[in-house]
Each structure stands twice: as structure tokens, then as C-alpha cells.
Amino acid sequence: MHEPVLRADRTVTFIGRKLPLGTIHSEYAGDVKLYTLGVPEALNRYKPAMRVMERQDFRDTLEVPNAHSHKYTRGVLGMLTGSLEYPGAALMSVRAALNCGVGMVRFGTNSHELRQLMIAHNPEAVYFSGTPAVQRVTVWAGGSGAGHDSLDKNRYLLHAPEPAILDAGACDLAAEYLATGKRLGPHKILTPHAGELERFLRIVHQVAPGDWAAHLGDAIVPSRRDIDAEPFRWARAASELSGATVMLKGGYTIIAAPNGATYSVAGGTPWLATAGSGDTLTGIYGALLAQTIAVLNTSDEPVEVCTYSAVGALAVYLHGQAARASVTGNAADPLDGPAPATRVAQMLPEVIARLLAD
């Protein structure tokens, strides 16, 4: 959607919400009123193009420890974030993960300076310097703030058996990986914003033109503006091309799985559009997913494809709630306003506690 566009005061829609109302374009709709016309039951046989989760859905998705829980049943998150160039990304992503209740964070770096910073600011994290392949973790998270000294470690995440959240520079590695003819699988989660998705798609178009043609025909590589205009289309396209789950971050975050299931989550507040916000979200998502996968591993239940999307939606929701709570320092009195990433991370325990108390 490109300007000029008339903005409505109110939009009336029938039977079910239409796709654009689950994207950033809903800002043009004003107050939305849905009239079901008494037919929702008849729609249950159809698969929706997109799902929008409610607060109770988020509550049901959140894993809660019990009297028998210990740190390993709470999940171990391996993190390969930050670098000497971007040490803040490591500190913020790890702090956010720790504040979401994961059993352990194992942080990997060969940098003595970064290790000392981590010990000073996040002493709960456990440090390792060896190869990621020998570490015992439940879920990996990497790419946020990665520099030349850490990208090589991040390459391991592309073929690691564990689920992995691939942010920022790791998305580029994922695009290059497709040149081998391999696919990533739904347990690999790409978390680009529109600019990073543009770069990902351009790389795929260059290194895997056959796959591009098979899935997208003669479609040209979209610009960032194109992706902003059609986020649903391009998140789905990236998932189809890669076989991965794709979280396209924005005012409305679109999460697309390779089986076609797609979720939409409002971003909470536009004040989250700051440096460090994505690093914090990586830590939140990694911590929540590690807890979920640990529980499923204990029960020997299979991990459904939609699990990665649902937990991702929960992460986006908590991120937005913590941002609004950070303005007042009180989750019971949230407001829109400046929300620096470090403040957002501080509010996560209270926001999670309030979700559980509802």
C-alpha cells in the first residue's frame, strides 16, 4: 500500500477479519467492527490465511515451572550474539533471555574483553569458548550484533540439530547456505526486519536462482518498500524458499511457517523502533523457545511446526508489553513513550508475572 491513501474512522467487516487487518495496514482502518453474521461455526472447516493470537492464547503458550522443575528442565539457551564491534548486542540479548526464566544461558565467545563485560553485567550467564558443536543446549540464538570474529561460530547453527533463532547477520548466512541445495527446516527461525529480508531475498535470488524460479516464478527481488507494502506475501515467500520459519519484524510482526501457517502480532508500540530492540527480542524468543522445547523433550511429545510460530508470537507480545511498561516502571500502568532496550529487558519479569496472574 502506497500513499496517498484515505484513512477511515471506522471499518465494518463481515464474517471474519480480512488479511490486511492483521498487518500494519490496519492503521488505515480506524476502529474495526466485526459482524460474524452467525456463520463462524461453518468456517471451522477452513484453514485461515493468518491467525491473530489473543491474551489467553499467549498465557496458554507460556511454559510455567512446577515443584519438580530444575535448571535443565527449564531449558538451556546457547547464545552466539554480539562481538567486539557490537558488545551491547551480547549484553542486551543475554539479559533479556535471563529475565524470561530460562534455566541457563550459555554464552559463547573467544573474546576475553567480551567475556569480562558479560561477567560484569550478566553474571548468571555461563561462558564457553570452544566449538558450539560440543555444547549441550536446548535451543540456539545467534546473529544479533555478530562481527567477523563471531560469524564463523554462527555458521554452525545452520545445520545444528537443535532449533536456532537466526537474527541479523545470521540471516545472510542462511541465504548463502541455500546455495548448497539444502533447506533449513521449520526449527530454524529467521528474524529479519524488512531491510534484512530484502537482503536475504536478493542473496537467495543470486545463489539459488532455480529455487527462486520454482517458488516465485519470474517475480523480481522486492525492495524494502515492497516488503513493507506486502509483508504477508514476502514473509511467506521467504519461508517457502528456505524451509525455515520466518519472523518478519515490524509494526505488525508476521511469522510464517513453511507449512503455510502464519501469525500476526501487533508490535506493542512504535517506540520500540530503536537500536538494540531486535537484540532484546532475540533473547526473549530464545529463552521462551528453550523452555518450551525442554518440556516437550521431557515428555517425548513431537514438536509441531506451529510451535515455533506460536512461541515467536508470545515473544513479540511480551516485548511490546515490556516496552509500554518500561515508560512508567509499572506493568499495571503502561504508556507509550521512549523504550530503550535495557529498560525493556528490566520489565520482563513483571510483565510475565502479570500475564500469569490474569
Locate the predicted segments by residue.
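Proline/glycine-rich low-complexity loops and linkers
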Residues: M1-E3
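Small-residue (G/A/S/T)-rich helix-start motifs and N-terminal tracts that mark the onset
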Residues: A8-T11, G16-A168, D172-I189, A194, ...
